[in-house]
């Protein structure tokens, strides 16, 4: 197990202030910004720091990536449409909270069933951070194409993320992210570095695409130690293709 263990994003906010620990991407957006000090000029149109390296999207852009919401419509995470009635998300987005709606293009689609991977947690530690959501009615957005069996990852391959970091639908700019590698300790995920931008609270369950627009990962976590954000992680979908096929065929 890695030294700086990555906890569930739903618990991460309580741990961020502790030194020498790693935290996951939490589902909820920041509550508010710090008010300016006396005599300080604050730009009304200034983007929040987590938008560095990203562009805002309107709800009708990239509609295959939607937000998740509880029954009252409160949003808290992201999901990716992979066929008209099935959505992939991070497992922790369905752990301790029940996703009720998948919101695509501003339209609400009721979630009929939630299936967590059977190895989501092993000995209380998140291992397979993935879940399949089944919609009651088909979503008209064009689904994301999944990677094929035998897909080869290579260090330096350009990546693009789409999610709801900070409660804002956003897409990483070209060149911001690239594939870094997979660790022995976490064989079900891959790493990309937060050098020119980072995934953020609310991106959980969002999409990671390669340079051909193929869905290769689901956003899982970020890691912080001693106050330094040093790592972004995504679920490796090549590891779970058989389970995804079985889950979508049975639900």
Annotate each PLM feature:
Residues 1-10:
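Bacterial N-terminal signal peptides that target proteins for export
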Residues 10-19:
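Bacterial N-terminal signal peptides
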Residues 21-88, 97-104, 112-115, 176-181, ...:
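Protease-domain processing segments flanking chymotrypsin-fold serine proteases, especially trypsin-like
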Residues 57-61, 73, 81-82, 106-108, ...:
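Extracellular/periplasmic catalytic domains that process cell-envelope and extracellular macromolecules
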Residues 66, 79, 85, 89, ...:
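Terminal peptide-recognition signature
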Residues 73-76, 200-204:
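Short, small/polar residue-rich loop motifs at catalytic or cofactor-binding pockets
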Residues 90-95, 200-202, 217-225:
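Short beta->alpha transition motifs characteristic of CBS
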Residues 126-199, 203, 224-247:
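Chymotrypsin/trypsin-fold serine protease catalytic domain
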